[in-house]
């Protein structure tokens, strides 16, 4: 089992959710986060004053999938989150040692 963590632009969340849903991946955790990568933030004008915005709003999507779903899930996220502009995000894939559904006690693949 793998944990896929994707950091995406907030307005792309619904597209990402819909493309994962088409693969049968319906469970996910969404977190509002702030951060920056190569774009290093930006400046904005507010009431005539210039402000530096160091951290940009992003969405963190976390999904647990079986090993055979990893590549399809990554492809779906890339296709739906891509704008072709800087700041589109990142995808991280890590191993899951154990998954447990609290309500039923199911474990691993059955718990996903």
Q: What do the predicted segments below correspond to?
A:
Residues 1-112:
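Positively charged, small/polar-rich N-terminal and surface patches that mediate targeting and assembly
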